Amino acid sequence: MNIEAALARAQASQGIIPEWAAEEITKKAEVRYMPKTEVDAENEFVRHRLVSRLNVWKRSLENGAEEYLHYGATTVDIFDTVLVLQIKASLGILIDDLIEIENLLLKLTKDNIETYMAGRTIGQHALPITFGKKTSTWLAENRRNIERLKAVEEKINRSVILKGAVGTYLGLGSKGIETELLMSQELGLGTPYIADWHGVRDVFAEYALTLALISKSFGRIGDELTLLQMTEIGETLENLGFKAIGSSTMPHKKNPRGPGNLVNFSRIIPRQSEIILDDMVNSFERDQPRSDETLKDISITAELMTDTAIRLLNELEVNKDVMRKNLNITNGLILSQRVTYFLADIIGKDTAESMIHDIAMKAITENISLSDAIKNLSLIHI
């Protein structure tokens, strides 16, 4: 209704319809003039999602204003613009959520800039890092995701459409382009793309693919925190409260819920995006298949994902003592590279690497520390 009213005002300013008609349409652009029961009854007769609504709305318009409602537009003009406004609202929520997540990650990173832990590659202890270093990668990725959403938002803001069934402005005539611009401004959107996109869905596909990419960022965080909360590691904890139940049969369980949900979202959203991507393939100027419902679904799922991430980061506990303890599990072997490069300046890199490798393997075999193995160089054939 707001779109039809914006269209009427834009047309009135161009002299396409009378000013009084635009005022009447705007005045009656309220849901109470389109009761659902009447719309449902009308739809049983006309079998058209928009015409049924327009017919009911027209009953409330006076002095012949109904003749100018939906003047020169087509159904997809209205519903595609509705979709644009919905996605714009969704983007606003998502960007706000990512900014909140950015602030939470920034605090988490600052608080743990000196929280030492084992850096792991391919599931093995590799080199020492800090937990703040780990979360700084989440922070940087989240910032890039904010910029990605803002870039998509600019394109969505230009995607209002009033070009008619085949993109020629035939219903509006020579004033079509200017009327479309004025309607877009009335709706708080940007300068519309000149090219018709009823059958060109790349902007919506980019929106969906951006959400898919963002879901993988959160999936990575969820997977990491699931692993770090393992009984054998225990370096982080999603603190759901003392009374929280992890299992109906195992009282000791503290299952990570938020992390698992993030991983699940990272699987669902990319599958949804594939449907929207497929919708780019259209026959002629416009085809029948539409992914509008999937666009709504993916937007709702994305908002559930960011809400989950916010709750998780607010509830996250970092077990610094456990991280320090786990750092020493290898009895100092995690520092073998540092020792290698210290010796490299004395005996050469290749010789040092060969020597420390043999020492490290000896330490593992005999279950002694790296420092003890180095002290006992007589055990190693150099």
Roles of regions detected by a PLM:
Residues 50, 135, 176, 200, ...:
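Active-site-proximal structural scaffolding
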Residues 145, 197-288:
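Glycine-rich anion/phosphate-binding loop at the beta-strand->alpha-helix junction
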Residues 61-65, 150-157, 230-234, 270-274, ...:
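Proline-centered turn/helix-capping motifs that create local helix->coil transitions or kinks
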Residues 133, 205-213, 338-346:
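Short, well-ordered beta-strand elements within core beta-sheets of diverse protein domains
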Residues 182-198:
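A short, charged helix-loop
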Residues 1-3, 42-46, 248-380:
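Glycine-rich cofactor/substrate-binding loops
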